[in-house]
Amino acid sequence: MNWLLHSNTSLLLRITLGVLIFATLALVDYARHRQHATRWREYTLLLLAVAGAIVYGVLNDQITSTISWEYFYYGKGLEEQLGPQTPPATLPLHLAAALVGVKATWSAGLLIGVALLLANNPSKRVPRRLRNRDLLTLIPLVFLVTACVGAIGGYLGYLGLPARWNDDFDQMLRHDEWRPHRFMAVYGVHLGGYLGAALATTLAVLRTRQKRRALISN
């Protein structure tokens, strides 16, 4: 059970099982309700949000592993997986970084999708809902805002801002270890990405509710 829940090799299996569960629920909903089925559209939105997050995570970590292999090798503990050679071979590094990206983002994508669906739930005050296709248009904007905030975080990291509150980064700068400015730039990209995703999801939820209120006035 521990292998299934925590190992890297079972990650694809866990994601596949999740997709199959949602696909099965969607098929059951469609079989029962046919043209009146709605759940399958919601499950599709969740799957697309997860897929978008995975793509973002993989691309993000392909770029950042090029900027600082040290961040992944030392910071993410990949030295055992990649071997003693430094810098590590390019292809194994990028494959390992891709896996790190998938692990870090698939659950975030699920949370984004759930947040949008909850924001679109009918209530007594706002009974009308947006179409799921309208919600889908917000997902690319979420990742765009995430990328922009991540880029800002990367710039601030390159300037050495994290060293002001983290002694490890301060020591890296003092001893010029692991190309510290690049290391902190990647740290800033990742931290900024998490903050950006939270901000963007909040904005998307507010936008969803705003659009729903506009439906009432129309």
Functional labels for PLM-detected ranges:
Residues N2-F22:
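Hydrophobic transmembrane alpha-helical segments in integral membrane proteins
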Residues L11-T16, P87-L110, D176-A200:
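Hydrophobic alpha-helical transmembrane segments
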Residues I15-D29, F143-G154:
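Hydrophobic core of alpha-helical transmembrane segments in multi-pass integral membrane proteins
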Residues L27-L45, I63-G75:
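Membrane-interface helix-loop junction between the first two transmembrane segments
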Residues Y30-E42, G113-P140, L206-N218:
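Cytoplasmic juxtamembrane regions at transmembrane-helix boundaries
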Residues L48-Q62, L136-G160:
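Hydrophobic alpha-helical membrane-insertion segments
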Residues Y71-G75, G150-L173:
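Juxtamembrane non-transmembrane "cap" segments at the membrane-aqueous interface
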Residues Y71-L93:
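Perimembrane loop-to-helix junctions flanking transmembrane segments
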